[in-house]
Regions:
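All-alpha RGS (Regulator of G-protein Signaling) helical domain and cognate RGS-like helical scaffolds
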Residues: 103, 114-123, 132-205, 210-211
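Short alpha-helical hairpin
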Residues: 17-19, 73-90, 120-127
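C-terminal segment of N-terminal export signals and the immediately downstream linker at the start
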Residues: 51-88
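N-terminal export signals
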Residues: 18-21, 28-29, 35-56
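N-terminal secretory signal peptides
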Residues: 1-31
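An amphipathic alpha-helical core segment
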Residues: 189-245, 250-261
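Early transmembrane hairpin module of multi-pass membrane proteins
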Residues: 87, 93-122
């Protein structure tokens, strides 16, 4: 089926309407010169009728209709990883990140966008969607909650992570939990004892740093606290690399992967 542009193009190349070949035929009494001049005339008409898209890339761009923005842009978008898929090895493998980020997180984004349509939370911030849908819309909450958790999870890790904790954050942890060693011990224990899928957390509640845990896609947001560090203990997060050794995974995370600068950034936001 031809488009209007194609039809115009065909007419211009054929010559006068309803007489496709007539303009190309010289009459018996025409001179060669007149035949040549008529040929030039037909060629000029044909060239004038060819649409702009047959020309340069600039002509194409000038004649292409502008892309219209979505009337309601998607609220959830899969972020790029802030490092290469193999950058966290040997503590988290390339294969784990390919499955975890590229497949599992993408599924939360896709499902979340579909479930968000037509709800009262459409167009609201991710944090508002998570808090608002909790206890009211389980399907939306599960996917929005996991999207929120993973948006930060990728930033809570970095190559050559772990190491020294920034001073202000270190003091807040010591004031809230007792010591850095105790915080790490309780954090690992929270993850190990989380039955089934879930997360373990450092969070700020009432101005104090606490260690806590949550099931499935829940987070401290739904209990009135603000998360500043979280570790995913769903099996897809560690089973390729650690099999059933969840404690080893949690120890590797807290000692070798944590991006304490980002944790500090979230802490500063939480106490404002």
């Amino acid at each position: 089926m031809s488009t209007p542009e194609q039809s115009t193009n065909q007419k211009g190349l054929q010559g006068p309407e309803n007489h496709p070949g007539e303009a190309h035929l010289a009459q018996p009494n025409e001179s060669p010169r007149r035949d040549f001049l008529k040929g030039l005339s037909v060629t000029a008409v044909a060239l004038a009728a060819i649409p702009a898209h047959s020309g340069s890339a600039q002509a194409q761009a000038a004649n292409r209709p502008p892309i219209q923005p979505e009337s309601k842009p998607m609220s959830f978008t899969l972020p790029d990883l802030p490092y290469a898929h193999d950058a966290l090895q040997p503590f988290m493998s390339k294969e784990t990140l390919e499955y975890h980020h590229d497949k599992h997180h993408l599924a939360y984004v896709t499902n979340g966008n579909n479930l968000l349509k037509g709800t009262e939370w459409e167009g609201k911030s991710l944090e508002d969607i998570v808090k608002g849908s909790f206890g009211k819309n389980a399907g939306l909450f599960n996917n929005a909650g996991q999207h929120y958790n993973h948006m930060h999870f990728w930033k809570w890790m970095k190559p050559n992570g772990g190491g020294a904790i920034p001073g202000k954050l270190e003091k807040a942890i010591i004031d809230g939990v007792g010591s850095i060693d105790k915080m790490k011990e309780e954090f690992i224990q929270a993850g190990v004892t989380q039955f089934g899928s879930g997360w373990c957390w450092l969070a700020v509640k009432d101005g104090k740093v606490i260690v806590t845990k949550s099931a499935n896609g829940e987070s401290p947001l739904v209990t009135g606290a603000k998360p500043i560090l979280g570790c995913d203990v769903w099996e897809h997060s560690y089973y390729i690399d650690y099999r059933n050794r969840r404690p080893d995974y949690l120890k590797a995370f807290i000692e070798n992967l944590v991006n304490w600068a980002y944790v500090e950034e979230m802490y500063e936001a939480a106490i404002k």
